[in-house]
A protein has these predicted regions:
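Right-hand nucleic-acid polymerase module
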Residues: 1-347, 359-637
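Short hydrophobic/aromatic beta-strand micro-patches
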Residues: 354-358
Length: 637
């Protein structure tokens, strides 16, 4: 028994706590013999092999490189690292890669006749291959790795990729993402993610995602957007809440899009299908036994060897969908619609797709999809029923059919009283867990299929209401603008040329421009500036984004210090609670990590760009301020 307890002690702290508390509970509430049974049978025989397999797959990739064997034990501690330890580890990796790059550069210059020989595609491709190859030990795919393997590397590509590999902050972001997924993979292996414990995502993941969002919200409240030219300021939080970053607006846009797709399909005589695709059983860490209310969750031993994560399940579904699309193309078949990705109770993803096609093509499309859905392990029990399901959609019923899945995966809107088929729990309560799952594994939940670009639709909606642009372009472009202006997605599809129209043949596309600035990796910055019509030429651009904005801290109105109150005025002007106050409003000073996380959320709405030098300067200033504040507090104390 002591040997098993010692094994528990070697696990990350969050798992130590989990298993130790469970052992003590069983021992206290049942019997010492029950506690011993838990240790020997449940933990050592069933759970420990799963945990060890996850650690083996997530640990250092010695097959890719043995250049970092000295850091193997430290890397194995990643799930248990705090932020301070992680930053030190990231800095050490970046420093070693920089030293390796310098060493290889000197060797190349000496062998081929001086430092000027380094500035060629051949030289930098060689150096990149060595440095990036070593970095792959940490389970990352360096930028442009596929280009390098194909012999298509250029000096500019090499500089961009290497400049990331030798930067501390880049490694901090990579390691934080890995830490989050590694922890969740261990909790899945431990049986903590299922309908009986915590459906869709672990309690730790749900808590962490919720905490990050609260931190982001505090940051957004503490900042404003400032016009670079006029100095005009607007609330950052109001800008975000008026964009698709707001779950309510995102849901409404999706529902409007789906309703428009269905109306378009009806107008052209197409028929609808509701498709469900799932993964083979080996991707599921658990299985359900029994029926109805007596159904229970058991560990799936077929998962133990592969230890697939939800990300692996998503890759599988993307791979078979790619094969299906190729088969459609080879057989002159076309589909269009919307895809929704959601998790099973144990975190394994599955797809729901609302697809439309010509009536005469539906049978062939279903046969192709079924064939590829059952290609891997199609012989296993239940595969024919579970892996692929296709239902005919009644005219006018598609939007209502898929609305539940959209609300469940965003904000739980209008789901009061409805129960989740997977967990038996209220659907309204599952939205937080599902969004935490998507955030943890970075799985996009919604994707249009075969539709005109959504980017152009959103840019057209930025134009002044009711103002024609026909004189600037032509009637095709004006028809697209008018449709977007009214939120009529059916007319927008028609104006763009219909479903499955190649982008270059669409009436309107997003216009981008390379600015005079470069980012921190010395790369050109490309910004969305407006729209253009491919059939009229790329030089005719209508600008939709006339102003440039930057994030700035709010100006806080600080009340003058008086000595009229009964309490003594503080000796130090520093608020030792770490808060800034303005009148009766208290604003939390955001931490550097909060700044960085919120900036990532703002990239999607087009208000700022992460690679904007102004943004980088703001974040660096915040980092510096946070680093200095403890020292100031100590002095003032």
């Amino acid at each position: 028994m002591q040997g098993v307890l010692n094994r528990i002690d070697r696990l990350p702290f969050f798992l130590q706590t989990l298993f130790t508390s469970r052992y003590n509970f069983i021992r206290r509430k049942k019997s010492p013999l029950g506690g011993l049974y838990f240790l020997k049978n449940t933990f050592e025989r069933k759970l420990l092999p799963r945990l060890e397999r996850v650690n083996e797959l997530c640990g250092m990739n010695e097959t890719a490189s043995i250049g970092f064997l000295s850091e193997r034990d430290q890397y194995a501690r990643l799930p248990d690292m705090n932020d301070k330890e992680l930053r030190k580890f990231a800095a050490r990796i970046a420093s070693q890669l920089w030293s390796k790059y310098e060493e290889l550069s000197d060797a190349w210059a000496e062998a081929y006749g001086g430092k000027e020989t380094l500035f060629t595609d051949e030289a930098q491709s060689h150096l990149y291959g060595q440095v990036a190859g070593i970095a792959r030990a940490f389970n990352i795919t360096p930028m442009f790795w596929k280009k390098y393997r194909k012999g298509q590397m250029t000096i500019r590509m090499a500089f961009s990729a290497i400049s990331r590999l030798i930067k501390d902050e880049w490694w901090v972001n990579q390691l934080k993402a890995q830490r989050m997924r590694w922890r969740e993979a261990l909790l899945i292996a431990a049986g903590e993610v299922n309908k009986d414990r915590s459906p869709y995502a672990s309690k730790i993941a749900i808590r962490d995602v919720h905490a990050r969002r609260l931190a982001n919200l505090e940051y957004l409240k503490s900042c404003e957007l400032e016009n670079k030219i006029t100095g005009e300021r607007i609330d950052l939080i109001s800008k975000v809440m008026g964009s698709i970053s707001n779950p309510e607006i995102r849901r409404m846009e999706l529902m409007n899009t789906i309703a428009g797709i269905e109306r378009y399909a009806t107008s052209v005589g197409d028929v609808g299908m509701f498709i469900t695709l799932t993964t083979p059983s080996k991707y599921h860490p658990t299985r359900q036994v029994g029926k109805g209310e007596s159904k229970t969750v058991q560990l799936n031993h077929g998962w133990n060897e592969t230890a697939f994560t939800p990300k692996d399940g998503q890759r599988y579904l993307c791979r078979i969908w790619s094969l299906m699309r190729t088969a459609f193309k080879d057989n002159d078949l076309e589909v269009y619609g919307m895809r929704v990705v959601e998790p099973h109770h144990d975190g394994t993803p599955h797809w729901h797709m609302m697809l439309f096609c010509k009536p005469g093509q539906r049978k062939a499309i279903n046969e192709i999809m079924r064939r590829y859905a059952l290609k891997e392990d199609g012989h296993e029990k239940g595969a024919a029923k579970q892996r692929f399901e296709s239902r005919h959609l009644n005219q006018g019923g598609a939007a209502g059919y898929i609305a539940k899945y959209i609300a469940k995966n965003i904000d739980g809107y209008a789901l009061d009283g409805q129960l989740d088929n997977d967990t038996g729990k209220p659907l309204k309560d599952t939205a937080a867990a599902v969004t935490a799952w998507a955030s943890t594994w970075r799985i996009p939940q919604f994707k249009p299929i075969g539709l005109p670009t959504m980017g152009a639709y959103r840019e057209l909606r930025k134009l002044p209401r009711g103002v024609s642009i026909a004189c600037e372009f032509d009637d095709r472009v004006e028809a697209a603008r008018a449709a977007a202006d009214e939120g009529d997605f059916e007319r927008y599809i028609i104006a763009q040329g219909g479903a499955n129209m190649p982008r270059d043949a669409q009436a309107v596309r997003v216009a981008r421009k390379v600015t005079d600035e470069v980012n921190e990796y010395e790369e050109d910055i490309e910004r969305v500036v407006g729209i253009y019509a491919p059939h009229l030429g790329t030089d005719r651009v209508h600008v939709t984004r006339t102003a440039e904005w930057r994030i700035v801290p709010k100006v806080l109105a600080v009340e003058p210090l008086t000595l009229k109150s009964g309490s003594a005025a503080p000796r130090s002007p520093v608020n030792n609670c770490g808060k800034l106050t303005g009148g009766e409003v208290t604003v939390m000073a955001p931490s550097p990590s909060e700044h960085a996380a919120a900036v990532l959320d703002l990239v999607d709405i087009g208000a700022i760009r992460l690679d904007d030098p102004e943004v980088v300067m703001v974040l660096k200033a915040a980092l510096k301020q946070d680093a200095l504040s403890p020292k100031r507090l100590q002095k003032s104390g």
